[in-house]
Regions:
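Short, glycine-/small-residue-rich phosphate/pyrophosphate-handling segment
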Residues: 62-109
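Generic structural signal for helix capping and beta-alpha/helix-loop junctions
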Residues: 4-6, 77, 118
Length: 143
């Protein structure tokens, strides 16, 4: 997204038209301070507008579309637990996405996460995620 919008000026109409073309949507991003990167938050704020994504006049343009997240997380999966350092599961941290997409009547589906990338950023570690991610996408496409 930063490559498409280096000035961070999002072409809202273009993005809305792109979303309207597909029934399955994947938001892929690195977990950033236990949330989304700033430009993705801006994208959600600017693209999911009243009268298009929600509201009485909208027709809920994202409604019924299957939406998921694909996340790279810096820390190990085991650390996302109530009895560990970060106190919350990744699913709990992603609840705002679930609520956002439910609010606009999208079909929010289970997410994909690849953990431990902060300490294991070797090419080999990253390449291990490829078949897992490919399988996730293939299964998501069948839903």
């Amino acid at each position: 997204m930063y490559k498409v919008y280096p000035d961070e000026r999002i072409d809202v109409k273009k993005e809305q038209q792109l979303i309207e073309q597909y029934d399955h949507i994947v938001f892929q991003f690195p977990l950033y301070w236990f949330s989304m990167p700033p430009l993705l938050k801006k994208w959600l704020d600017e693209v999911l507008t009243y009268g298009w994504a929600y509201g009485s006049k909208s027709g809920y343009k994202v409604g019924g579309k299957k939406v998921t997240l694909a996340i790279s997380a810096g820390i190990d999966e085991r650390e996302y637990a109530h009895n560990e350092k970060y106190k919350y599961t990744l699913k709990e941290l992603l609840r705002p996405f679930e609520l956002t997409f439910e609010y606009i009547h999208a079909d929010f589906r289970p997410f994909f996460a690849y953990y431990g990338i902060e300490l294991n950023s070797t090419t080999e570690w990253i390449e291990r995620s490829v078949p897992l991610y490919r399988q996730f996408l293939e299964e998501f496409a069948k839903q």
